Amino acid sequence: MDKTQRSQGKCPVMHGANSAVASNNMDWWPKALNLDILHQHDQKTDPMDPNFSYRDAFNSLDLAAVKQDLHSLMTDSQDWWPADWGHYGGLMIRMAWHSAGTYRIADGRGGAGTGNQRFAPLNSWPDNANLDKARRLLWPIKKKYGNKLSWADLIILAGNVAYESMGLKTFGFAGGRADIWHPEKDIYWGSEKQWLAPSDNPNSRYSGARDLENPLAAVMMGLIYVNPEGVDGKPDPLRTAQDVRITFARMAMDDEETVALTAGGHTVGKCHGNGKAQDLGPEPEGEDVEAQGLGWLNKKGRGVGCDAVTSGLEGAWTTHPTQWDNGYFYLLLNYDWELKKSPAGAWQWEPINIKEEDKVISVGDPAKKFNPIMTDADMAMKIDPEYRKISERFYQDPAYFSEVFARAWFKLTHRDLGPKSRYLGPEVPSEELIWQDPIPSVDYRLVASEIVELKAKLLASGLSVSELVATAWDSARTFRGSDFRGGANGARIRLAPQKDWSGNEPERLQKVLKVLSALQASLSKKVSIADLIVLGGAAAIEKAAHAAGVNITVPFMPGRGDATKEMTDVESFVVLEPLHDAYRNWLKQDYVVQPEEMMLDRSQLMGLTAHEMTVLIGGMRVLGTNHGGTRHGVFTDKVGVLSNDFFVNLTDMAYSWKPVGTNLYEVVERKTGTVKWTATRVDLVFGSNSVLRVYAEVYAQDDAKEKFVHDFVAAWTKVMNADRFDLA
């Protein structure tokens, strides 16, 4: 069937299909709470068998054989996408870099950990142009090793091997990145409605003088880092330096790492802009089926090799773009540079009066040479005073530069992989790095009878059910499944900065920690504070469940260590501070975003589903764990009893709900007009949202008392063990 015939036919599905252009619920009701971020990545989208373990599969992989195949690929140029100077290293490094470079510290999202570069929007971002070709070049290797090697791991490994093949001694490589199977729904990339929109356009990510919206790190929609031509495409290295500094800081990089990564990334490979951007076809997501997932295809010629167009800039940064050397700093610091336009019309910097021997051999004709080029960000490494000092040192000490870069590259490509306990493979570095949030291992075991005895001592310590539960929750709730930071393991709630966070109620926290420390000191057997905190929560929940008439044992696995202040980078933990916690009915202040939206975001980071979120909220309310002891949402007369009262009263039509202030409501008896309870938006949303109400009704039913307790315990245990990667 040709396109003409297809366009004339009517939809064969009665009333139309909802796979493409039909309106969905969010189109009709844009203010409705969208729970999709809690429903992504479920087993229905995962083609792997239910018992498949990527960890086990990767551990059976012959990594040396994979690396040998990658080494061979680097110089095996293909006619359909020829390698620059016969080496794919620059392309593979850019692919790996752009996979890892979407990471941002504010929420831990982005990064290389899921293979998300295969999906929209990343696969079609302007800054990722022609990386579809890099992944197609890797397909024979992925096909060969199958499920033992994820795309996420292969992409980073390819970048590592590319550097090694060009002479760099890398710091190491760890596997363990499991693939996802559809685009992520939880990542906010910005609110702009067009690619590469200038910062003064509507829906800009900038406010004030040039304040970049959190949690974003990139300066434009569709870019990984900064605009290579300058701020909003206007060359000015000093202004660009500020963009670079903010962007890399939001990726957890300091100035030295920033200079090293910029220089090391541009020591090899080249920019492509020897043509017109308007000659390129759509990005992969916008192409037709015959393109088979490829995009940016040249409509007026092959558009490959020396005629390729990617960023629009044209040229290499160094004289020898297929070898690791110090040529970047040699050229940058020894020549004066002037602004020029590339053949595609992009701004770039070129050297003045360059020596013939310092020019770059043409990709297409070895008899020709061209000027090297620098982006505005490269010029920032020379013009900005602090970056200049670092550049000078790297230039004078190439070995130091190589070491700093290798470590920074490892950090860039492993930052979102989590602690070292998640690392897989024979090339994992032995050195503990502070950005990995190290936790000491424990050397004790607890048998069942000892755990029972400890629970009794915790319940007899004078601490209340709410104090024990709230402390365990506060310790564990920092976990982020995005970059696997935070959690109860390490008991960093006792250390700065967590011990002083207002969300942790420092005065109450210190009271609890003092009691737990005294209990720890009295024990004949060593037990970590981290384990005691979690066990205290378990003991309290068992007591509350028993009071509700349900006998249950909360699962507990000892083995958590206690981190020290020397193991803790205080500054890096600042971003984990909770500014809201729906589970404890707390907001640090009023925000533009509605509390229920923030609840979804936090729940998604913790790895919770919608029904797990629901049952935890209901349980935490009746246990009396609200921040500061407030009574909002505590729909029960039996505080401290793990009952389903929250849901019973929420769904009871004997009550009406009236707003009495910002994020505050009264629950009023319809017959008498008496105020029975107070509530917040995150309480009432479980009765107002149609999906959440369905879950609330399940737990409000007369036959749900035991189910509620069992489901609460299961969800609680999931949160407490979220960072126990040793149990995987």
UniProtKB/Swiss-Prot annotation:
This is Catalase-peroxidase 1. Formation of the three residue Trp-Tyr-Met cross-link is important for the catalase, but not the peroxidase activity of the enzyme. It is an enzyme of class 1 (oxidoreductase). The keyword Lipid biosynthesis does not apply. Its cofactor is heme b. GO terms for molecular function: catalase activity; heme binding; metal ion binding. It comes from the Bacteria. Residues 1-22 form the signal peptide. It holds the Pfam family peroxidase. Belongs to the peroxidase family. Peroxidase/catalase subfamily. Homodimer or homotetramer. The lineage of its organism: Bacteria, Pseudomonadati, Pseudomonadota, Gammaproteobacteria, Alteromonadales. There is a cross-link at Y225-M251 (Tryptophyl-tyrosyl-methioninium (Tyr-Met) (with W-97)). Bifunctional enzyme with both catalase and broad-spectrum peroxidase activity. The active site is at H98 (proton acceptor). The record marks R94 as: Transition state stabilizer. Heme b binds at H266. It catalyses: H2O2 + AH2 = A + 2 H2O; 2 H2O2 = O2 + 2 H2O. GO terms for biological process: cellular response to hydrogen peroxide; hydrogen peroxide catabolic process. Its EC number is 1.11.1.21. Keywords: Heme, Hydrogen peroxide, Iron, Metal-binding, Oxidoreductase, Peroxidase, Signal. One of its GO terms (cellular component) is cytosol. There is a cross-link at W97-Y225 (Tryptophyl-tyrosyl-methioninium (Trp-Tyr) (with M-251)). SUPFAM superfamilies: Heme-dependent peroxidases (SSF48113). InterPro entries: Catalase_peroxidase, Haem_peroxidase, Haem_peroxidase_sf, Peroxidases_AS. Binds 1 heme b (iron(II)-protoporphyrin IX) group per dimer.
